[in-house]
Design a protein with these regions (language model features):
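Polytopic alpha-helical membrane-helix bundles and their juxtamembrane interface segments
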Residues: 1-222
Length: 222
């Protein structure tokens, strides 16, 4: 079965390039057709590479379904459902980081520092985004969401230090890409649209997912 993963990982990259082409050309029909194939392919690649790593491909599945909901981003309720599915995927990543790198046994001061930094990061994002997102509820939702991105980025750094394994920095890189992608998505959805908006959103999103998945896979047996 692992042979299939060696086919599916390159297929994911090929499909990503094709999808990004349609994003750049603003071909809505084929952009919407190709988008759901991306995380489905990546999730299947993980499944065939390491069937026991079910949480990794379950997180990909939540992103796959979330992608489908976000195709209807003009409907605010559907957009919220899609965002919630991505939040579940991030929570799965949080659990993986804590359980895989023994973060559950680290000193409580690490969590105190996390709490302080998360509050600071959330407040900074809340006020930085203010010129681009006037609605208080939407700005609050954005700030809370990116706090989860920050938490996973923080845990990936702590995991790197605890395990002496720099491969966890791939997960950090992934969450930096996620922050760029989701910030662009929020601004263009709730403030002002830009030409070819889907190209930078999807480019950074796909780099984020690939970095995170590779980070978890490459640290499987370490």
């Amino acid at each position: 079965m692992i042979i299939l993963s060696y086919i599916l990982f390159p297929l994911f990259i090929i499909l990503s390039i094709i999808h990004l082409y349609f994003c750049y050309k603003e071909n809505e029909k084929w952009r919407k057709i190709t988008k759901p194939t991306l995380l489905l392919t990546l999730g299947l690649a993980v499944l065939f590479y390491s069937p026991s790593s079910y949480l990794i491909y379950i997180a990909c599945f939540f992103c796959f379904v979330g992608d489908i909901f976000l195709l209807f981003n003009k409907n605010e309720k559907i957009f919220v459902v899609g965002g919630t599915l991505f939040l579940v995927a991030h929570l799965i990543h949080t659990f993986l980081l804590i359980s895989r790198s023994s973060l559950d046994r680290i000193h409580f001061s690490i969590y105190i520092i996390l709490g302080i930094l998360t509050i600071v990061f959330g407040l900074l994002s809340f006020f930085i985004i203010k010129p681009y997102m006037k609605n208080l509820d939407k700005r609050t939702s954005y700030s809370l969401y990116v706090c989860f991105l920050f938490i996973n980025a923080y845990f990936s750094v702590v995991a790197t230090i605890i395990t002496y394994n720099p491969l966890y920095l791939l997960i950090l890189l992934g969450y930096i890409f996620y922050l760029i992608s989701d910030t662009t998505l929020f601004i263009t959805t709730f403030h002002r649209d830009i030409p070819r908006r889907d190209f930078p959103i999807m480019l950074t999103y796909l780099l984020a997912e690939l970095s995170i998945v590779l980070g978890f896979i490459l640290t499987l047996n370490l």
